[in-house]
Amino acid sequence: MKKIDKKLFHTAFIVRGTGVLFAAIFLSACSSSPVPNYYSLTAQVSPLANSKVTVIEVLPVGLPDRINRAPIVIQDVTGKSQILDNERWTSTLGTELRDNLSAGLQQKLGAVDRYNSGMVGGKISYRIATDFSRFDIVNSTNQANEKVEVSVAWIVKRNDPTITLDQNSNQNQQLACRMSFNQAIASNNKQMQQVVSTANSALNRVVDAVALSIISLDANKSARIDGVTCT
């Protein structure tokens, strides 16, 4: 009986040891997986000296589901998309766009975004609703055609607490604008940092245009902005 017990013990030890070995191999394989690279959009704009706007409210942006994700999506000219799981935004692209649109407008206008600040009413404010139908990184066999394609529309609505609710209260209180453009990616450098830098430049153009539309509405003037249609 003692010999049988020893054999059983020896067999159990081997099985257990084999299980530990496989677990170690599995963990080693997992640890060797590529480490993702993370990128952020960063608005870099120059302040407007003539801005009198003090309060804005930047709402979450609209963005197609196909690109509203953390992994960076590259699209080719045929419409085929490639999701880069190891090249990622630090948050979803929609959040990156909203947060940096807000940061850029605050810097550009010298204003405070009350959307997340808890600031109450009492001052004239401007609510900005933005919808990106395109913010696509487009790859091409022809390096000269690599670009970030942008199509964006926005509505700026003025909230003036001093205006009473009468038949004229909606006059000059809202402005709707749209723009589309391509931002070329430098053909001499296809690194992801250059792609992200180009996306930043594209966002900066949007920030500049939105800021000028807010300034126009604040001054009760028609918005005349290069490459932008406003009604």
Question: Which residues fall in each region the model found?
Answer:
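Acidic, proline/glycine-rich low-complexity intrinsically disordered segments
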Residues: 94, 103, 107-111, 122, ...
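Short secondary-structure boundary motifs at beta->alpha junctions and helix caps
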Residues: 80-90, 161-212
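Surface-exposed short loop/turn segments
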Residues: 31-47, 111-171
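Soluble periplasmic/extracytoplasmic beta-strand elements of cell-envelope proteins
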Residues: 55-60, 73, 127-132, 149-155, ...
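Sec-exported extracytoplasmic/periplasmic mature domains
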Residues: 102, 106-110, 211-219
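A structural "domain/chain start" motif
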Residues: 30-95, 219-231
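Sec-dependent bacterial lipoprotein signal peptides
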Residues: 1-30
